[in-house]
Amino acid sequence: MSSFNLVQIVPSLDSGGVERGTVDVANFLAQKKIKNFIITSGGKMIKELDDNLVHVHQLPVSSKNFFSYPSIGRKINKFIQANNINLVHVRSRGPAWMVNLMSKNNVKTIATFHNVYGCNSFFKKM
């Protein structure tokens, strides 16, 4: 398997299925001695992460303010470049927009959309 640097982007790590999946994937990779990253606004589940191989970078990715997305996207892009990230897993619509608005690079992106409450808004469907 070729080496890769993964970053997962999730709004928060407080509680829930998305958060549990994020922590489980990060710790699984750490058990395999694969350094990986999480960008999040914070949360109580951070303490469940392997401190040696899972690196948490806090940015306001839980923001619902669409006008802040380009600025946050640029910060994400700088993080991706500084850490030689070649795989991004976006786990929410807001961060997906942020990643989409950042400058284009050769990073593969996976987006997971968890639709629990319905999807009536045009912007939420994008």
Question: How should these model regions be labeled?
Answer:
Residues M1-M126:
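Membrane-interface segments of envelope glycosyltransferases acting on lipid-linked substrates or membrane lipids
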